[in-house]
Amino acid sequence: KTAEAVAARYFASQPASQRGFVRAAPAPYRAFEKTVSKHTHQTHCIIGSRAFGISEDRRLPLALVTNILGGPCANSLLNIVVREKNGLSYNIEASYTPYGDTGIVAIYFSSDHSNAEQCIELIEGQLHKLRTVPLTARQLSMAKKQFIAQLAISSESNESYMLGAGKSLLVHDGIDTMEQVYAKVRALTARQLTEVAEEVFSDMSRLIYK
């Protein structure tokens, strides 16, 4: 009620705005591979695919899978395999961004030109593993705990939390508490993660600048 009172105080006199355009539906997705010569010092590569929109329930298991694959943690699969074990890339990460009517999942890395193909092979190996081999109970439990810890840390930023809450209110007409979010993460199963990985990671596009 306090928030409503503050909003009414500052915005009640403002006229409502109406969108003057109709958003076109995303075109059918077709995977591609493209290499562009940019004469860069390193090879820069993005491997990605269309993913779930913000209204789909499967966005949460995909977010967890993406975090396991290449999230902001030293023990992500790609960081261990590509960077730590083989020393092929200093910068490698995966991200998932949901939009109103679609989404995108992407893996980015940079490397010496001579290491790019090996990096791609290792990445494809991890994608295949996530699609075909379910996580063990221990692996899943550790991944959930880490993801929840990351969410808890990010919620300490008031600005970040309020932006997320505002988006949730606009899209879902409600705001989950952090405990509700944690409960949804804890309820995810290894099968759910394998299923979304199979659907999203099976037909990836590739763009290379070198």
Where are these regions (language model features)?
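N-terminal short leaders/motifs
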Residues: 44-63, 158-163
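Charge-rich, well-structured scaffold segments of protease-associated domains
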Residues: 1-19, 52-53, 70, 84-210
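A generic structural signal for well-ordered coil/turn residues at beta-strand boundaries
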Residues: 29-30, 41-43, 47, 61-63, ...
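Short linear Ser/Thr-Pro motifs
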Residues: 75-76, 157
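Active/ligand-binding-proximal structured segments within catalytic/core domains
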Residues: 47, 57-70, 77-82
